A protein has these predicted regions:
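Hydrophobic hinge/microswitch elements
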Residues: 66-67, 140-185, 190
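Short beta-strand->loop
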Residues: 94-104, 179-192
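Alpha-helical "hinge/linker" immediately C-terminal to small N-terminal DNA-binding modules
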Residues: 1-23
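Acidic, Gly/Pro-rich loop/turn segments at junctions of secondary structure
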Residues: 65-120, 129-134
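Central regulatory/effector-binding core of bacterial HTH transcription factors
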Residues: 28-90
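Secondary-structure junction motif
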Residues: 118-146, 152
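A late-sequence structural motif
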Residues: 187-223
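Short amphipathic alpha-helical coupling segments at ligand-binding clamshell hinges
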Residues: 2-6, 43, 118-120, 204-218
């Protein structure tokens, strides 16, 4: 078991080497991009097609990874770029803040307000460490959340089908708010999360990574 991480690193390296050979034959570059499930739900999914269109000649590998795994892969140089809520504090990595993501209180119940928001089938979504600390100060429910998840999409689907309330990024619920399927509970406090990118400072594809970071930043401007 102790050798398993080392074996996984070797396999990942071999797989990437095979892809690199194929890319070299076709004169393409490859960039691997990873985000946590919540990053994909709340941010990356809305711009991945624009990124692909803006980088012709680049083969993009997009993956869902937990934060700790992304950090490890960056340090092993088997991942080029990670998009994260809680950036790693590692000297070998370049970390940049690219945007701020508004997270708002929404409910399937039109009568939801600050007095009953947390007691009416409240779904807790883990939006990272900073959010957890903020949430601990704001929570005034009389019982624990009736459902917990680390994925915003699961929370959204649940409250749409079964009713309830949750803190969800505004970008993810805009259509439901316009359609009247969800309601913004405006007298409940809202928050936001900073989104960061990280890559190895010695990455040989830094110019391409910088272009990708610029595209991600522009994605926030467009949204």
């Amino acid at each position: 078991e102790r050798l398993l991480p080392h074996a996984q690193m070797i396999i990942t390296g071999m797989q990437r080497a095979k892809v690199d050979v194929a890319l070299a034959d076709n004169m393409h570059k490859q960039i691997s991009l990873a985000g946590t499930p919540n990053i994909w739900d709340a941010f990356l999914q809305f711009g991945i097609t624009n990124i692909v269109s803006a980088m012709p000649g680049v083969s993009l590998v997009a993956e869902v990874k937990a934060q700790q795994e992304s950090t490890r892969l960056l340090l092993e140089r088997t991942l080029d770029l990670a998009v994260l809520f809680d950036p790693p504090k590692v000297d070998e990595l370049v970390v940049e803040r690219i945007c701020e993501l508004p997270i708002i209180p929404v409910s399937a119940f039109e009568t939801a307000n600050s007095e009953n928001f947390f007691d009416n089938q409240y779904v807790y979504v883990d939006w990272g460490t900073t959010f957890s600390l903020w949430h601990a100060r704001e929570f005034n429910g009389h019982a624990p959340p009736y459902f917990r998840t680390s994925t915003g999409r699961i929370a959204l689907d649940l409250i749409l089908k079964c009713g309830g309330s949750a803190f969800i990024p505004k970008l993810l619920v805009e259509e439901q708010l316009k359609a009247g399927d969800l309601y913004h509970v405006e007298d409940v406090a809202h928050t936001s999360r900073d989104v960061f990118v990280a890559y190895h400072r010695d990455n040989e594809q830094t110019p391409l990574l910088e272009k990708l970071v610029t595209l991600l930043t522009e994605l926030q401007i467009k949204t």
